[in-house]
C-alpha cells in the first residue's frame, strides 16, 4: 500500500470499527486525517455446504444467500459516510473456519464463538501480523486502533493479540 494513513483501525469483522469507533473515525475523516479501517475477517464463506449453525446465523442476519456481500456493501457505505478508506483481508470469519483434513469446523455454536480459541487458530495472530506489516510498514506517525474485546468474541481476541506480537 502506497498511501499514508495516520489512523489505522483493525476491525475484526465488517461493521465492528464503525459501531465501536464511528464517532472518532468521523472526526478524523472530516478533519482530513484519512482514517483507514482494515477488516481482518472479511472473507467469503467456503464453497462447501454451510453448517446448520452458520445457516441459522445467515437467516437471522436477513440474507441467507449473499450475507458477506451484503455486509461488505453496508460497511462500505457506512465508512463512506464517516470519511474513511477501507481495506479488507480475505480471512474467513470464525464461523467458516475449519474443515481441513479432519472435516471439523472450529466454532459450531454461539458458546464456541465466545469460548477458547481453537488450537488450529493459535498461529493466526502471527500470520495476520505478518500480513499487516507488509501492508503498513511500521513507522512514525501511525496510530493503530484495536478492539478491547468486550464480549470476548474469538475473532476480537485474535485481533487484539496480534498487536502484542
Task: Report residues per predicted region.
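Active-site rim/loop-helix segments in enzyme catalytic domains that contact anionic ligands
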Residues: 1-121, 125, 129-139
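Short, well-ordered beta-to-alpha junction loops that form the rim of enzyme active sites
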Residues: 12, 89-92, 146-156
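Active-site histidine-anchored catalytic micro-motif
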Residues: 18-27, 147, 153-156, 160-161
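Conserved small/polar residues in nucleotide/adenosyl-binding loops
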Residues: 164-165
Amino acid at each position: 500500500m502506497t498511501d499514508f494513513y495516520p489512523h489505522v483501525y483493525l476491525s475484526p469483522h465488517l461493521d465492528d470499527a464503525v459501531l465501536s469507533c464511528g464517532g472518532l473515525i468521523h472526526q478524523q475523516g472530516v478533519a482530513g486525517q484519512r482514517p483507514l479501517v482494515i477488516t481482518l475477517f472479511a472473507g467469503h464463506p467456503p464453497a462447501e455446504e454451510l453448517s446448520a449453525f452458520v445457516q441459522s446465523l445467515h437467516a437471522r442476519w436477513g440474507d441467507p444467500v449473499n450475507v458477506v456481500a451484503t455486509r461488505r456493501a453496508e460497511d462500505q457505505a457506512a465508512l463512506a459516510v464517516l470519511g474513511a478508506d477501507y481495506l479488507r483481508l480475505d480471512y474467513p470469519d470464525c464461523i467458516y473456519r475449519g474443515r481441513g483434513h479432519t472435516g471439523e469446523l472450529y466454532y459450531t455454536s454461539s458458546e464456541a464463538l465466545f469460548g477458547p480459541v481453537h488450537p488450529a487458530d493459535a498461529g493466526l495472530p502471527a500470520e495476520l501480523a505478518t500480513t499487516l506489516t507488509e501492508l503498513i510498514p511500521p513507522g512514525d506517525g501511525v496510530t493503530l486502533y484495536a478492539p478491547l474485546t468486550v464480549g470476548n468474541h474469538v475473532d476480537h481476541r485474535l485481533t487484539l493479540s496480534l498487536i502484542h506480537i
